[in-house]
Amino acid sequence: MRIEQDLKLGFKDVLIRPKRSTLKSRSQVDLNRQFTFKHSGKTWSGVPIIAANMDSVASFKMAISLAKHNVMTAVHKHYSVEQWGEFVSSQTADVLKHVMVSSGTSDADFIKLSEILAMSEELNFICIDIANGYSEHLVDYVRKVRQAHPQAVISAGNVVTGDMVEELIIAGADIVKVGIGPGSVCTTRVKTGVGYPQLSAIIECADAAHGLGGQIIGDGGCSCAGDVAKAFGGGADFVMLGGMLAGHEQSGGEVIEQDGKMMVKFYGMSSQSAMDKHSGGVAKYRAAEGKTVLLPFRGSVDNTINDIMGGVRSTCTYVGAASLKELTKRTTFIRVQEQENNVYGKE
């Protein structure tokens, strides 16, 4: 047993210090990034925000809507090959280039992934996702997928420390997904005592990834546009959002009427609800590590994504960053004990 004395920080522990700016308007800020990925050699440009691979968030409808904003969707892994076929055949390259194909790590997942990728040359992104990215099994699976699909852009996770980021990149991942337990419907930290404050995880993992020519996705913990900006400021190349994009007409969650109001079911992918739906219940040897909540129906996701991007543009103007790429260079975090004045309630 050992104790690390360094304080680790989450988004609520800091604010970004304003700096002089020559920008006259938020409209001058460019949120598009261009990346050339280490192993695949592929180049992608767009707004590096990703809808999380949850079946009550990342539906095909979500992918179609977010592609209009140059935003990515990690489409959840529970669609059948037939459903993927219908989607791919009905969409343009402009949509498909903003889609990530999600996969588990079983032999069946590998076969299904290969069948889906074969449907279109525009499907370039793979999201390999397991809750515990510290498993050697994940590293072996990344090697297997890289060997079978050398042209694909592979993201893998989830992890929270630089050593594992480096191992996954060396094994063949272009991008590493960072975050254990910060999500709004995740209870891993409560059930297991395991986790890492998300901002510190992003800062440390970005440093490790960038040293090897890789990228990271900050996955989880964002509850407002300011948190998204802090994630980018901390060095995240991409930011993945679940709860912030849940509850919309494109999210795919079950719609329920409660007391005359439209509500949408949203749940973690290790929750009782998810395991009842996809695995026939919670196995006897494990515990559910997610919540199920009802969110007020929020209409179209277009308004929400515009609000998020508007907030990040505003962050850039406050620190003098003309582009999202410059934001991390212009970011100085200050530790705080307060975030906002809630005398009239929260935003």
Swiss-Prot record:
Reaction(s) the record says it catalyses: IMP + NH4(+) + NADP(+) = GMP + NADPH + 2 H(+)
GO molecular function (one): GMP reductase activity
Residues involved in NADP(+) binding: 108-131, 216-239
Subunit (UniProt): Homotetramer.
NADP among keywords: yes
Pfam families tied to this protein: IMPDH
Alphabetic keyword roster: Metal-binding, NADP, Oxidoreductase, Potassium
EC numbers, comma separated: 1.7.1.7
GO biological process, one term: purine nucleotide metabolic process
Source organism superkingdom: Bacteria
Function: Catalyzes the irreversible NADPH-dependent deamination of GMP to IMP. It functions in the conversion of nucleobase, nucleoside and nucleotide derivatives of G to A nucleotides, and in maintaining the intracellular balance of A and G nucleotides.
Classification via SUPFAM superfamilies: Inosine monophosphate dehydrogenase (IMPDH)
EC category: oxidoreductase
Protein name: GMP reductase
Active-site feature positions: C186
InterPro entries: Aldolase_TIM (IPR013785), GMP_reductase (IPR050139), GMPR (IPR005993), IMP_DH/GMP_Rdtase_CS (IPR015875), IMP_DH_GMPRt (IPR001093)
Amino-acid positions noted as binding K(+) in the UniProt annotation, renumbered to this chain: G181, G183
Entry's family note: Belongs to the IMPDH/GMPR family. GuaC type 1 subfamily.
Source organism of the structure: Shewanella halifaxensis (strain HAW-EB4)
A GO-annotated cellular component: GMP reductase complex
